[in-house]
A protein has these predicted regions:
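Non-catalytic, mostly N-terminal accessory regions of nucleic-acid modification and defense proteins
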Residues: 2-242, 246-247, 309-318, 420-424
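Conserved S-adenosyl-L-methionine
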Residues: 229-335, 340-342, 346-351, 357, ...
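Short, surface-exposed amphipathic charged segments that create phosphate/polyanion-binding patches used
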Residues: 327-329, 430-433
Length: 433
């Protein structure tokens, strides 16, 4: 659209457009078609891999290995590209980090960790580990050491919390991979080869955000096949886009975005696509209570090329132990929190005096935390900000404490609109929201 506006093409009927404008429209249409074709091809390939590799292991349990190996390949190639570009700009035109000795690579460690947030020695890059994997009788141990070294590379640095534990769920010694070391290593070789053969490099060089797109697709498929548990970590793309669009009406940029129950981060990352990540000036913030899903969220940030210093995802219970007191207020807050979750409520005498909840004069019921999330979001919203939250319909009509909280919200004109979504939109539930 920007191209068309610059050439004054967008305001004319198609039959009156000049040749140059028609050619640009044709190019744009062809580009969109190419993107969809590449995306469809990538999706077919990666889901086939996920199904072929898991064997008798439940897909939901095996997802950690597919997603973890995808992450390992991404950070390896991302780091290699960064170092190669830097060296080649300096005049070393034939430089290739993958072929550098580990000893020489050590000289750049400190500066690279400061910039990229992690470091991988050449011998431990995905491409080099894969090249030797088939003949490595101790491949499981090799990978365990590599993952440990990647995590240790950031100890004491600003990015330590962003990388810590990201490989914990990828247990290379698990019986899920096989009953013997030999069987596990065979599965790991297949996994390395399958992820390595994906044409992600070609896609990244051309028209789609390949690594991030592959990750989002895999999580969509895992959520749709996991039933109820899938909805705990993933918000459908259509809903994510709606929430993001609502919060940025009339805005071309925001200071920070926040999700207090961020799951895998799909809602937060929608802002990077809708606004452009550079227009979320101070970054992406979230908190997730489930440790495995918290790890998935941080991986998702890296795979969408969000630098470590531009996101802050915390682990813990947002309602009783919020981690971002020093980061609020936020211009845009979005969330799809768990429906009617139990929480401490008046069982914790400190909460009634918590500045997030005290303005309403009551706490959300112990068995229904829905409006506790709403009050938390309202408290951390900037004066010019907008929040959009997915709620269980019961918050609109239930009595007791929830009725009093609703009255507080309405009397103070905090509610702009209520939108009813269709049933069957969310994984694992048929209820409307």
């Amino acid at each position: 659209m920007e191209i068309l506006e610059e050439k004054n093409c967008s305001v004319e009927p198609i039959n009156t457009l000049n040749k140059e404008c028609k050619e640009m429209i044709s190019m744009a249409n062809n580009l969109n078609t190419t993107k969809e074709q590449e995306r469809a091809e990538l999706h077919r390939a990666i889901w086939q891999i996920a199904n072929d590799l898991r064997g008798s292991v439940d897909g939901w349990d095996f997802k950690q290995y597919v997603l973890g190996m995808l992450f390992y390949r991404f950070i390896s190639e991302n780091l290699t590209s960064y170092i190669n570009e830097d060296e080649r700009r300096s005049g070393n035109k034939d430089f290739d980090y993958t072929k550098l000795s580990d000893k020489k690579a050590e000289f750049g460690r400190a500066d690279t960790v400061k910039e990229k947030g992690f470091y991988i020695l050449p011998s431990e890059l995905f491409v080099n580990v894969r090249a030797k994997a088939r003949h490595d009788a101790n491949l499981n141990e090799t990978l365990a050491v590599v993952f440990r070294n990647i995590e240790n590379s950031v100890k004491g640095s600003d990015s330590e919390d962003d990388l810590k534990g990201l490989f914990d769920d990828m247990d290379v010694n698990s019986n899920k991979l096989g009953g013997t070391v030999e069987q596990r290593n065979k599965k790991l070789v297949k996994l390395l080869d399958a992820i390595g053969d994906l044409r992600l490099g070609e896609y990244a060089d051309n028209t789609i955000d390949a690594f991030g797109d592959a990750y989002e697709f895999l999580m969509t498929m895992y959520a749709s096949t996991a039933g109820k548990s899938g909805g705990e970590f993933f918000t459908p793309q259509e809903v994510s886009e709606l929430l993001a669009e609502i919060t940025i009406v009339g805005k071309k940029e925001v200071n920070k975005v926040y999700d207090p129950a961020c799951g895998s981060g799909s809602l937060l990352l929608k802002f990077a696509k809708v606004l452009g990540k550079e227009n979320v000036r101070q970054g992406f913030f979230g908190q997730e209570i489930n440790l495995t899903i918290y790890n998935l969220c941080r991986i998702n940030m890296f795979l969408h090329d969000i630098n470590y210093n531009h996101f802050d995802v915390a682990h813990g219970d947002t309602l009783t132990d919020p981690k971002h007191w020093d980061d609020e207020p936020f211009d845009a807050i979005v969330s799809n929190p768990p429906y009617s979750k139990e929480w401490e409520s008046d069982g914790n005498p400190l909460l009634i005096n918590d500045p997030r909840f005290s303005p309403a004069g009551v706490l959300a019921p112990k068995r229904r935390a829905d409006l506790a999330f709403t009050m938390h979001m309202l408290s951390w919203l900037s004066t010019s900000g907008t929040a959009a939250i997915v709620e269980y319909p019961g918050v609109l009509y239930r009595g007791g404490a929830e009725q009093k909280i609703r009255k507080y919200l309405i009397d103070n004109n905090y509610i702009d609109t209520v939108i009813q979504l269709s049933p069957d939109l969310f994984f694992g539930t048929t209820i409307a929201t």
